[in-house]
Amino acid sequence: MGQLGFFDAEQRLAALSAKGDPLEAIDRLVPWESFRAEIEAVVLTPDEVRKSSAGRKPIDAIVLFRMLVLQALNNLSDEQVEYQVRDRLSFTRFLRQGIEDSIPDATTLWLFREKLAKAGLIEKLFDRFDQHLAAKGYMARGGQMVDATIVPVPTQRNSRDENEAVKAGRIPQEWYNKPAKLRQKDRDARWTKRHGRSFFGYKNHVNADAKHKLIRRYEVTDAAVHDSQKLDELLTKGNTSADVFGDSAYRSSEIEERLRACGFKSRIHVRATRKHSLSEAQANANRNRSKIRARVEHVFAAQQTALGGRIVRTIGIVRARAKIGLQNLAYNIRRLVTLERIAAA
């Protein structure tokens, strides 16, 4: 079998472009260089901030960031995304690398994400992209839709005593004696029940605008935190409408008062109780609100299908925040491509 040459690669890439490589649209629409200063301030050591071109240079930070975006877009592990970049010309091109260039390995990518996670930088990069969305004309419009979805992590097989110690914020003594076991235990994830099913992991609380279905703010907590507990952190004055849409989990007299005091208009579903069923007017109001509120479910559905699922395989809430934040960013990037395609039609 002959070796793939430069012109062979160029011909294959041209054929991919002719077929419609979706990564080319993403590459064109994302302002990659606008992220550089913040990323390099976190990931480069003083020795890597070189004043000359002598010696071996570190891997470009934007190449690694592009690789994280690829990973989130396709729900790949570190090892899988390394393999796919080596194997697929479209992935290599997305990184702006040639067939002769070295590809970051899985360990390098893991270390890069660790630095971003510990610095809390993913949230800032998400906000920077939101500024780019507004600059392109996609300001938050039509009201704020709030909701939360469970993000599972691999189940922990702990004894009852171990679970009680973790809930109390303690580390079981047996784990101290087995450092390898301790490293594999997620002490931040929690169990919760939804629709009669038990889940272990975290929650992705989001605020999406009703007009564009773009995520504008998000918060990551353990799965046991009630949806309504993060409402204050999610709401923003940046939407052109004062309407706030949410399911009945966000309904309480206290929340209604807070919304009014902050100048928001509650469009939160009214909940029926055992003693008080909904009036016809309340049921009609809920139906009308559902026509808009249901759009936030499209966000989670897209993350589940187009982005390959929501499960994360990290340990600890710091890493979970980074992975979930990257998933939210990847959703907004893909959504921008869709909005631009609709606008051009």
Residue map of PLM features:
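Basic, amphipathic alpha-helical segments enriched in Lys/Arg and hydrophobic/aromatic residues
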Residues: C262, N284-A345
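Basic, short loop/linker segments at the boundary and entry of helix-turn-helix/winged-helix-like folds
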Residues: E24-V69, L73, I103
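Secondary-structure capping and boundary motifs in well-ordered enzyme cores
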Residues: P31, G55-V63, D101-D105, N288-I292, ...
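Charged, often Cys/His-bearing segments associated with DNA-binding zinc-finger transcription factors
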Residues: M1-L44, T338-A345
